[in-house]
Amino acid sequence: MSCVNIRGCCIGEGRPKVIIPIVEPTETAVLEKAAEFSALRADCVEWRIDCFEGAKDLPAIVHCAAKLRVALKDKLLLFTFRTKSEGGKVALAHEEYLHFIHTVFATDCADLIDIEFFTAGAELPALIEEAHTAGAAVVCSSHDFHKTPPRAELVSRMVAMQQAGANLPKLAVMPQSRTDVLELLAATAEMADRHPETPIITMSMGALGAVSRLSGEALGSSMTFANPGQASAPGQVQLDIVNEVLDALHL
């Protein structure tokens, strides 16, 4: 599997890199969390802007982003606006979403930016190219909070993300059975073995799928989201447990 190197952090090499989310509503609370998180054992902090009370206030986002970048020191910063249709807090019209993405580019604060595969639509390749020009790597994401599509569909979706230029295709799906968890894990291994052009991020959500958040090094997922006290998605495992298990399973 290839490696995405950001700030000396090689995503896709060795131990899966750990992401912890900031889901606070105010700038003050966001920055307090950032100061706390800067000392934790995690590689990347995700700012979930849809949880921010100024989620549609672009100047407020820009203002907070600059302070957040400083507060996190050397940790990677991932900007994410999870739309309501993909499990987030706020609904955005297509043009609003595009405007948000361009605003993040202009901050010059993002190490990584999440761009939703289906929300971006036909604009996806151009957005990814613009992100790269702005110096940000792209996590191209797709979330299904109701089901787990068949393995072939999961693989083809991640390949399409690669072909659009994404640095890190990401899939999060909801299992309805143990077989669904295995389907996601099989798709992950297939991508890592047959389409190693980029690292990938995958997870099966909820308690049933939690094993997928811990098995990435063996099966091919390069990053995992951990719960530092407040989860941003169902099934996120506590940060200290994630680190303990990743250490124990390190190849």
Task: Identify the meaning behind each predicted range.
Residues 2-3, 13-133, 143-148:
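Active-site beta->alpha loop and helix N-cap motifs at the rims of alpha/beta catalytic domains
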Residues 6-7:
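Glycine-/acidic-rich phosphate or pyrophosphate-binding loops and their flanking alpha/beta elements
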Residues 102, 112, 117-251:
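Catalytic alpha/beta core domains of metabolic enzymes, predominantly
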